[in-house]
Amino acid sequence: VDDGARNIAEALEMARQAVAAGTDTMVATPHRGWFLGRPARPQAVREHVAGLQESLNRARIPLKVVPGVEIKMAPRVADDLVNGEAGTLGDAGCWALIEPPFDRIPTGGIESLRKVVEAGFHIVLAHPERCAEVQQSLTFLEACAELGLAFQLTSGSLLGRFGPRALETAHAILARADDWPLVIASDTHDLHDRSCALLREARDAAALLVGAERAQEMVDARPRAMITPL
């Protein structure tokens, strides 16, 4: 479907790996970027996830997969969410996972996020620590926090897989854990370089900075709440 498992056999092996690492629920979040030709329409994602879940059940793999989408930051995101053209995490209708660019925040970026919030959705911003502008200054994230956004750190960033700047920025964001809602994502793409097994390592790395209880909350209770209908 996107840039994850290449076939069902690999998907099943990734699921086994996730279960072995202690995961019981995963959110499938294919990218949505209308300008990239990646619509990831909710119904299509639901159908693919349902098919995967059937395969997991047949293989007796105790993993629940729920639909989601990673939405490219753009002016039309609020309208797409309201119109049902873009999905939410867990198909719960509450939280939208929105991805900023890896270089600069676009002009009007904060306003596009404000419109999403005003439309009644919560936002979790995906991997902000990998954005070059955020690596230079947390000013944009401070503005996002004022809107009530949560921030999702990528496991690989906390383990230095995306370079020292991403690691340093992830640490700077973790330092705001008293004030900012944070979650940690596996960002699972494959069986090796970006595997689900990294999530436990990332949690342990975060625990060195924020404590074990809070780090566990970032990989369990808080993301679980995001996929639960209000």
Language-model segments: residues:
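An N-terminally biased module of ancient metal coordination in phosphate/nucleic-acid-related enzymes
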Residues: 1-60
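Extended substrate/RNA-proximal surfaces in nucleic-acid metabolism proteins
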Residues: 38-152
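Short helix-capping segments at alpha-helix termini
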Residues: 54-63, 179, 208-213
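Non-catalytic positions within long, well-ordered alpha-helices that form the structural scaffold/packing
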Residues: 16-19, 117, 174
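Histidine/acidic-residue-rich catalytic or RNA/ligand-binding cores of hydrolases
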Residues: 134-144, 161-171, 189-204, 230
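Short acidic/histidine-rich active-site segments
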Residues: 29-31, 180-196
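Mid-to-C-terminal alpha-helical segments outside catalytic/metal-binding sites
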Residues: 199, 204-230
